[in-house]
């Protein structure tokens, strides 16, 4: 808070961080931005489909989210939410036919259909939502994913020999956990895991500390986690 003064106009933060897999207290952060007269912009790439996203309740100025990650929508689908006071102030870098149309919502008119973009993945989002609801995603599937990742968490932590990133359970997203890597050269870790063990694991080396992230989806099982652990033992 000591770093924020009147010169700060925009505060941006993730709902769930990609590298460290931390679930942020976004309502508190939005209120913090408001109290300092700053615009709040939330990177919600990993949130929709993993945690409840109530845009009215969050009340941020802007929220950008993906549907093709945890919502299981076709690749390349996402959304931009803008509070009503910003709707008619957002201009796309490439204008669409809506630029010359009359109407009150410029956000939709100017961003809705641009060039030759294939909108069929967007039209499939409704089916994704219906699929999640029909399969009781938030009440049954996600809790099972959390149970699976928590069951193996201590074992993975033991393989790394590093401390946990999670001092408070409130910061743990339901289906993601990140782990610190010990000191050393991990530049080949991702490729070796993928090519030699057929394990896809994001490895983040662009920070002072190095991380890898484990994500669990409905199709993962105990066998997958055991194979992951054996691969980590081999390459870390």
How would you describe each model-predicted region?
Residues 1-45, 49:
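Active-site phosphate-binding strand-loop segment of PLP-dependent enzymes
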Residues 24-31, 35, 147, 151, ...:
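Alpha-helical scaffolding segments of alpha/beta enzyme cores, especially the outer helices
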Residues 108-154:
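Structural signature of PLP-dependent enzymes
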Residues 146-153, 157-196:
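Conserved PLP-binding catalytic core of the aspartate aminotransferase-like
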């Amino acid at each position: 808070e000591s770093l924020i003064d009147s010169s700060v106009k925009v505060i941006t933060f993730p709902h769930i961080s990609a590298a460290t897999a931390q679930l942020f207290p976004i309502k508190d952060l939005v209120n913090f931005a408001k109290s300092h007269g700053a615009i709040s912009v939330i990177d919600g790439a990993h949130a929709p489909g993993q945690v409840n996203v109530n845009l009215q309740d969050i009340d941020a100025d802007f929220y950008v989210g993906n549907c093709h990650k945890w919502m299981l929508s076709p690749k390349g689908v996402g959304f931009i939410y803008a509070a009503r006071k910003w709707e008619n102030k957002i201009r796309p870098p490439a204008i669409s036919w809506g630029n010359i149309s009359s109407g009150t919502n410029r956000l939709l008119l100017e961003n809705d259909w641009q060039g030759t973009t294939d909108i069929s993945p967007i039209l499939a989002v409704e089916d994704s939502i219906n699929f999640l609801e029909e399969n009781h995603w938030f009440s049954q599937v996600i809790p099972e994913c959390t149970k699976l990742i928590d069951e193996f968490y201590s074992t993975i932590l033991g393989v790394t020999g590093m401390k946990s990133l999670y001092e408070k359970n409130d910061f743990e997203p339901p289906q993601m956990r990140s782990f610190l890597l010990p000191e050393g050269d991990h530049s080949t870790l991702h490729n070796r895991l993928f090519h030699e063990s057929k394990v896809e694991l994001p490895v983040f080396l662009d920070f002072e500390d190095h991380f890898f992230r484990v994500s669990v989806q409905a199709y993962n099982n105990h066998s997958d986690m055991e194979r992951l652990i054996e691969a980590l033992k081999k390459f870390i």
